[in-house]
């Protein structure tokens, strides 16, 4: 795959991947700040107000870095920190009754899958059609049938 197709797919993937984080911050956590703080407090999150401010910053900054492809590895690390912490505080299915555990196990596995995507970005970078890509030397397209 070369140039336009790879670039379009990489950018589309970055946007789709970060949509959940941006919408969570902008449409839930910020407008419902005190309700989210109360929920975090109930779940035992230490210093919930400060934790929520840090969470919002991680979600927005990390997502923007990934979407525009500038410092995408750092952005992915920021979101990985958020995901790891949130997953173990809010989706601890092993501490729940069977009825609640099923839904939380699905949420846990969803987050685990997204963590895998963050690890891929940390390992491989943002890909084409990114600010990082436009500032690095170009390599000729590999047209071999195995790619």
Question: Which role fits each region the language model picked out?
Answer:
Residues 33-46:
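Short juxtamembrane and helix-loop transition motifs at transmembrane-helix boundaries
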Residues 1-32, 47-61, 67-147:
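Extended, low-polarity transmembrane helix blocks
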